[in-house]
Amino acid sequence: GGMPISTRALQEGKYTSVDSYPQQIADLTGYLYDSLPANHRFAALHASPIIPTAPEIWLLGSSYDSARLAAEQGTAFGFAQFFGNADCEQALRIYREHFTPSMLNEKPHSLAAVLVVCADTEEEANQLALSTDLFFLSLSRGMLLPSFPSVRTAQNYPYTENDYAMIRN
């Protein structure tokens, strides 16, 4: 439920392509910073409650394209090292080199989001990491699991040599 304009804003683009991301970022920026043109389709939409500052906008991405998009839009950029195959250092270099100052940021702001498994011992950490390995292995095959599998499920999974090679890389 909600007001029709807010419902439309939240549902717009539910099934859109990556090509609409730049416009979605621009719309979100305009909305959060109250800078949408008067004739914009969401110009009448206002955040509630009203707060003195807008939240920072960070684009989380795992590719060179997302680094460039964040740079072009002037957003902060978080590189999802745990998720992508792109080189983190190169992605952040692309972001910094192509950064365009905006109402969001005068200079580039970036971070690397990495996957870390912590435990009391290395053996325990390796056991806990099994569920993450199986989750990302499944994802690489186009199967999005509803949640991370349990360690037991991961231990009992019938891995192939190819699976182990993918996990190591």
What residue spans do the PLM features occupy?
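Short, well-ordered, mixed-charge alpha-helical segments that flank or form enzyme active sites
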Residues: 2-5, 49, 66-68
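Flexible, glycine/proline-enriched loop segments at strand-loop-helix junctions
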Residues: 9-19, 54-57, 79-80
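Active-site mouth loops of central-metabolism enzymes
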Residues: 51-61, 116-119, 168-169
